[in-house]
Amino acid sequence: MNLIPTVIEQTSRGERAYDIYSRLLKDRIIMLGSAIDDNVANSIVSQLLFLDAQDPEKDIFLYINSPGGSISAGMAIYDTMNFVKADVQTIGMGMAASMGSFLLTAGANGKRFALPNAEIMIHQPLGGAQGQATEIEIAARHILKIKERMNTIMAEKTGQPYEVIARDTDRDNFMTAQEAKDYGLIDDIIVNKSGLKG
Protein backbone atom coordinates (compact mmCIF):
# COMPACT_ATOMS: atom_id res chain seq x y z
CA MET A 1 0.00 0.00 0.00
CA ASN A 2 1.46 3.33 -1.09
CA LEU A 3 0.29 6.20 1.11
CA ILE A 4 0.97 9.73 -0.09
CA PRO A 5 0.97 12.30 2.71
CA THR A 6 -1.13 15.43 2.38
CA VAL A 7 -0.01 18.82 3.64
CA ILE A 8 -2.31 21.73 4.39
CA GLU A 9 -1.18 25.29 3.75
CA GLN A 10 -2.80 28.48 4.93
CA THR A 11 -3.26 31.03 2.17
CA SER A 12 -5.00 34.38 2.00
CA ARG A 13 -7.96 32.51 0.51
CA GLY A 14 -8.11 29.88 3.23
CA GLU A 15 -6.67 26.40 3.53
CA ARG A 16 -5.31 24.45 0.62
CA ALA A 17 -4.45 20.75 0.71
CA TYR A 18 -1.66 19.33 -1.45
CA ASP A 19 -0.23 15.87 -1.82
CA ILE A 20 3.37 16.10 -0.64
CA TYR A 21 4.85 15.78 -4.16
CA SER A 22 2.78 18.68 -5.49
CA ARG A 23 3.86 20.79 -2.54
CA LEU A 24 7.53 19.96 -3.12
CA LEU A 25 7.09 20.84 -6.80
CA LYS A 26 6.24 24.40 -5.73
CA ASP A 27 9.80 24.56 -4.38
CA ARG A 28 11.17 23.06 -7.63
CA ILE A 29 11.86 19.72 -5.94
CA ILE A 30 11.28 16.43 -7.78
CA MET A 31 11.51 13.09 -5.97
CA LEU A 32 12.70 9.94 -7.72
CA GLY A 33 12.09 7.41 -4.97
CA SER A 34 11.32 4.16 -6.74
CA ALA A 35 12.41 1.85 -9.51
CA ILE A 36 12.43 3.58 -12.88
CA ASP A 37 9.81 2.42 -15.37
CA ASP A 38 7.93 4.21 -18.14
CA ASN A 39 5.28 5.61 -15.76
CA VAL A 40 7.88 6.98 -13.34
CA ALA A 41 9.89 8.42 -16.24
CA ASN A 42 6.83 10.11 -17.75
CA SER A 43 6.08 11.70 -14.38
CA ILE A 44 9.67 12.94 -13.88
CA VAL A 45 9.90 14.20 -17.49
CA SER A 46 6.58 16.05 -17.12
CA GLN A 47 7.73 17.71 -13.91
CA LEU A 48 11.06 18.74 -15.47
CA LEU A 49 9.29 20.26 -18.48
CA PHE A 50 6.73 22.02 -16.27
CA LEU A 51 9.34 23.58 -13.99
CA ASP A 52 11.49 24.62 -16.94
CA ALA A 53 8.50 26.29 -18.62
CA GLN A 54 7.66 28.02 -15.36
CA ASP A 55 11.15 29.53 -14.96
CA PRO A 56 14.12 28.31 -17.03
CA GLU A 57 16.53 30.48 -15.02
CA LYS A 58 15.89 28.72 -11.68
CA ASP A 59 17.50 25.41 -10.80
CA ILE A 60 15.49 22.21 -10.42
CA PHE A 61 16.34 19.85 -7.53
CA LEU A 62 16.09 16.12 -8.31
CA TYR A 63 16.36 13.92 -5.20
CA ILE A 64 17.26 10.31 -6.04
CA ASN A 65 16.70 7.19 -3.93
CA SER A 66 16.29 4.54 -6.60
CA PRO A 67 17.47 1.00 -7.30
CA GLY A 68 17.50 1.78 -11.03
CA GLY A 69 15.27 0.20 -13.60
CA SER A 70 14.47 0.46 -17.29
CA ILE A 71 17.29 1.83 -19.42
CA SER A 72 14.98 3.41 -22.01
CA ALA A 73 12.87 5.06 -19.29
CA GLY A 74 16.02 6.32 -17.55
CA MET A 75 17.41 7.69 -20.80
CA ALA A 76 14.16 9.62 -21.32
CA ILE A 77 14.81 11.33 -17.98
CA TYR A 78 18.50 11.85 -18.82
CA ASP A 79 17.72 13.42 -22.19
CA THR A 80 15.10 15.71 -20.65
CA MET A 81 17.56 16.81 -17.94
CA ASN A 82 19.83 17.96 -20.76
CA PHE A 83 16.97 19.30 -22.88
CA VAL A 84 15.64 21.77 -20.33
CA LYS A 85 17.38 25.12 -19.96
CA ALA A 86 17.23 25.09 -16.15
CA ASP A 87 20.15 23.42 -14.38
CA VAL A 88 19.14 20.18 -12.70
CA GLN A 89 20.86 19.69 -9.36
CA THR A 90 20.93 16.03 -8.32
CA ILE A 91 20.97 14.85 -4.72
CA GLY A 92 21.61 11.18 -3.95
CA MET A 93 20.19 9.74 -0.75
CA GLY A 94 19.62 6.22 0.51
CA MET A 95 20.68 4.16 -2.50
CA ALA A 96 21.25 5.47 -6.01
CA ALA A 97 21.96 2.32 -7.98
CA SER A 98 22.22 1.39 -11.63
CA MET A 99 20.14 3.90 -13.63
CA GLY A 100 19.64 5.82 -10.38
CA SER A 101 23.39 6.42 -10.13
CA PHE A 102 23.56 7.27 -13.84
CA LEU A 103 20.96 10.02 -13.34
CA LEU A 104 22.72 11.23 -10.19
CA THR A 105 25.91 11.67 -12.21
CA ALA A 106 23.97 13.36 -15.03
CA GLY A 107 23.20 16.44 -12.94
CA ALA A 108 24.53 19.86 -13.89
CA ASN A 109 28.30 20.17 -13.55
CA GLY A 110 29.24 21.32 -10.07
CA LYS A 111 25.71 20.59 -8.82
CA ARG A 112 25.76 16.82 -8.22
CA PHE A 113 25.50 15.96 -4.54
CA ALA A 114 24.98 13.10 -2.12
CA LEU A 115 23.98 13.01 1.51
CA PRO A 116 26.67 11.59 3.83
CA ASN A 117 25.22 8.08 4.20
CA ALA A 118 24.07 7.65 0.62
CA GLU A 119 25.30 4.63 -1.30
CA ILE A 120 25.97 4.72 -5.01
CA MET A 121 26.22 1.60 -7.16
CA ILE A 122 27.35 1.47 -10.77
CA HIS A 123 27.31 -1.54 -13.06
CA GLN A 124 26.82 -2.48 -16.68
CA PRO A 125 23.34 -2.59 -18.24
CA LEU A 126 21.32 -5.72 -17.56
CA GLY A 127 19.24 -7.42 -20.18
CA GLY A 128 17.66 -10.69 -21.03
CA ALA A 129 16.81 -12.36 -24.27
CA GLN A 130 14.90 -15.40 -25.37
CA GLY A 131 13.80 -16.84 -28.64
CA GLN A 132 15.72 -18.00 -31.66
CA ALA A 133 19.51 -17.74 -31.74
CA THR A 134 19.37 -14.81 -34.18
CA GLU A 135 17.00 -12.90 -31.89
CA ILE A 136 19.32 -13.48 -28.93
CA GLU A 137 22.27 -12.30 -31.03
CA ILE A 138 20.39 -9.10 -32.00
CA ALA A 139 19.51 -8.44 -28.34
CA ALA A 140 23.14 -9.02 -27.28
CA ARG A 141 24.44 -6.56 -29.89
CA HIS A 142 21.84 -4.03 -28.76
CA ILE A 143 22.80 -4.25 -25.07
CA LEU A 144 26.50 -3.93 -25.98
CA LYS A 145 25.72 -0.70 -27.88
CA ILE A 146 23.81 0.62 -24.87
CA LYS A 147 26.71 -0.33 -22.58
CA GLU A 148 29.17 1.54 -24.81
CA ARG A 149 26.96 4.64 -24.97
CA MET A 150 26.39 4.71 -21.19
CA ASN A 151 30.09 4.18 -20.47
CA THR A 152 30.96 7.05 -22.82
CA ILE A 153 28.53 9.37 -21.03
CA MET A 154 29.83 8.27 -17.60
CA ALA A 155 33.42 8.89 -18.74
CA GLU A 156 32.50 12.41 -19.89
CA LYS A 157 30.62 13.22 -16.66
CA THR A 158 33.22 11.76 -14.24
CA GLY A 159 36.46 12.62 -16.03
CA GLN A 160 37.49 8.96 -15.75
CA PRO A 161 38.98 7.28 -18.84
CA TYR A 162 36.51 5.12 -20.78
CA GLU A 163 38.57 2.01 -20.02
CA VAL A 164 38.32 2.67 -16.26
CA ILE A 165 34.54 3.07 -16.48
CA ALA A 166 34.25 -0.12 -18.54
CA ARG A 167 36.33 -2.04 -15.99
CA ASP A 168 34.61 -0.60 -12.93
CA THR A 169 31.09 -1.23 -14.24
CA ASP A 170 31.81 -4.83 -15.21
CA ARG A 171 30.26 -6.00 -11.92
CA ASP A 172 28.19 -4.30 -9.21
CA ASN A 173 30.45 -1.59 -7.77
CA PHE A 174 29.18 -0.09 -4.50
CA MET A 175 30.58 3.22 -3.26
CA THR A 176 30.14 5.44 -0.25
CA ALA A 177 29.36 9.10 -0.84
CA GLN A 178 33.06 9.95 -0.35
CA GLU A 179 34.17 7.24 -2.79
CA ALA A 180 31.62 8.50 -5.33
CA LYS A 181 33.00 12.02 -4.91
CA ASP A 182 36.59 10.84 -5.35
CA TYR A 183 35.52 8.90 -8.46
CA GLY A 184 33.77 11.92 -9.99
CA LEU A 185 30.20 10.61 -9.84
CA ILE A 186 29.23 13.55 -7.62
CA ASP A 187 30.76 16.94 -6.92
CA ASP A 188 30.22 17.21 -3.18
CA ILE A 189 28.72 15.69 -0.06
CA ILE A 190 26.17 17.86 1.71
CA VAL A 191 24.72 17.57 5.19
CA ASN A 192 21.93 20.14 4.79
CA LYS A 193 20.20 22.32 2.19
CA SER A 194 22.72 25.12 2.64
CA GLY A 195 25.18 22.94 0.69
CA LEU A 196 23.04 23.18 -2.45
CA LYS A 197 23.83 25.77 -5.10
CA GLY A 198 21.52 28.75 -5.56
UniProtKB/Swiss-Prot annotation:
<keyword id="KW-0378">Hydrolase</keyword>
<feature type="active site" description="Nucleophile">
    <location>
        <position position="98"/>
    </location>
</feature>
<keyword id="KW-0720">Serine protease</keyword>
<comment type="function">
    <text>Cleaves peptides in various proteins in a process that requires ATP hydrolysis. Has a chymotrypsin-like activity. Plays a major role in the degradation of misfolded proteins.</text>
</comment>
<dbReference type="InterPro" id="IPR018215">
    <property type="entry name" value="ClpP_Ser_AS"/>
</dbReference>
<dbReference type="InterPro" id="IPR033135">
    <property type="entry name" value="ClpP_His_AS"/>
</dbReference>
<dbReference type="InterPro" id="IPR029045">
    <property type="entry name" value="ClpP/crotonase-like_dom_sf"/>
</dbReference>
<keyword id="KW-0963">Cytoplasm</keyword>
<dbReference type="GO" id="GO:0009368">
    <property type="term" value="C:endopeptidase Clp complex"/>
</dbReference>
<dbReference type="Pfam" id="PF00574">
    <property type="entry name" value="CLP_protease"/>
</dbReference>
<dbReference type="GO" id="GO:0004252">
    <property type="term" value="F:serine-type endopeptidase activity"/>
</dbReference>
<dbReference type="GO" id="GO:0051117">
    <property type="term" value="F:ATPase binding"/>
</dbReference>
<dbReference type="GO" id="GO:0004176">
    <property type="term" value="F:ATP-dependent peptidase activity"/>
</dbReference>
<protein>
    <recommendedName>
        <fullName>ATP-dependent Clp protease proteolytic subunit</fullName>
        <ecNumber>3.4.21.92</ecNumber>
    </recommendedName>
</protein>
<comment type="similarity">
    <text>Belongs to the peptidase S14 family.</text>
</comment>
<keyword id="KW-0645">Protease</keyword>
<dbReference type="GO" id="GO:0005737">
    <property type="term" value="C:cytoplasm"/>
</dbReference>
<dbReference type="InterPro" id="IPR023562">
    <property type="entry name" value="ClpP/TepA"/>
</dbReference>
<feature type="active site">
    <location>
        <position position="123"/>
    </location>
</feature>
<dbReference type="GO" id="GO:0006515">
    <property type="term" value="P:protein quality control for misfolded or incompletely synthesized proteins"/>
</dbReference>
<dbReference type="InterPro" id="IPR001907">
    <property type="entry name" value="ClpP"/>
</dbReference>
<comment type="subunit">
    <text>Fourteen ClpP subunits assemble into 2 heptameric rings which stack back to back to give a disk-like structure with a central cavity, resembling the structure of eukaryotic proteasomes.</text>
</comment>
